[in-house]
């Protein structure tokens, strides 16, 4: 009888000590500041290389490995949400607005900054798929980091950003785990910071208004539709800061919506059936006209120089072209504007 009680007691203790329950408690702060107080960051970029991202690494961030204490098989993931307005995108990631000139790229996720999820939009999204703790006590953390973005074309300037609420991360129990009344959401505010933004550009050495005298020709020199004859030539010269790549767009001043390669003649022209095309350097393909804008990627924008040239220039050739509508002799006048983009 004595031996029976000893065995029963041993089995009871073994079963008792392996019973555990999933549990979670909040050990973090509900309000958290991202980045150092009064941070200051400096960078230099070409004027139209926009949006321009300040490569601040993980310096503007918040990281805490101990926000929730979990145990006993508790399963937890993380969701994140940004409350700032979306003002653009870069490589599929939202740019969030802080001021008219400054925006943010934002990442949220687990404790490790490098695993942060690039945030897009203003809805809750999965930023950490999660894990299940074993029969022991551990913690779940989180991280947020941001990078400032210059949004608008401007000369060199200093931008100050005030403390701003940016969004939240919430703990997401799964696989039967429940948080009960435990705090699941933490909020984040971006500490104030200053950007010292230096821009580089170019100076036009050629007069801003260039008149190209067009040679007189006879209709017989353009016998068929599409035939061309050189009418005149000119050059554009610039002086650039180091590292600036110059792009340019021609705009048809008479018909700004023109996206073809034939310049519209002005109302002062009396000739018909003839147009003007513009070529650069030794190109065999005429330049097309686009919107009057310096924005990077502007329609029909073309590269004038590389970033290694500080004194770039381009030779332009104007050619008459038979438009196929029957040529009637007269005067030919056309006006095109050039817009430079410093990238």
Curated annotation (Swiss-Prot):
Q: Which of this chain's residues are annotated to bind a carbohydrate?
A: 65-66, 110-111, 138-141
Question: Which residue ranges does the record annotate as region Disordered?
Answer: 287-307
What S-S linkages are listed for this chain? 75-132
Which portions of the chain have biased composition (kind: Polar residues)?
298-307
The record's annotation in InterPro entries points to:
Adhesion_dom_fimbrial, Adhesion_dom_fimbrial_sf, Adhesion_dom_sf, Bact_Fimbrial_Adh_Pro, Fimbrial_adhesin_lectin_dom
Q: Where in the cell is it found?
A: Fimbrium
Q: Entry's Pfam families?
A: Fim-adh_lectin, Fimbrial
Q: Which residue ranges does the record annotate as region Fimbrillin-binding domain? A: 200-343
Q: What is its main location?
A: other
Q: Domain of life here?
A: Bacteria
Instruction: Print the keywords alphabetically.
Output: Disulfide bond, Fimbrium, Lectin, Signal, Virulence
Q: Which residues form the signal peptide?
A: 1-22
For this UniProt entry, what's an example GO CC term?
pilus
Which GO BP terms sit in this record? adhesion of symbiont to host; cell adhesion involved in single-species biofilm formation
Receptor-binding lectin domain: annotated segments: 23-199
What GO annotations for molecular function exist for this entry? Answer: carbohydrate binding
Report the family membership.
Answer: Belongs to the fimbrial protein family.
What functional role does this protein have? Essential fimbrial adhesion factor that mediates binding to N-acetylglucosamine-containing receptors in the host intestinal microvilli, leading to colonization of the intestinal tissue, and diarrhea or septicemia. Also confers adhesiveness to laminin and basement membranes.
Which protein is depicted? Answer: F17c-G fimbrial adhesin
Q: What is the lineage of its organism?
A: Bacteria, Pseudomonadati, Pseudomonadota, Gammaproteobacteria, Enterobacterales
What gene is this protein a product of?
f17cG
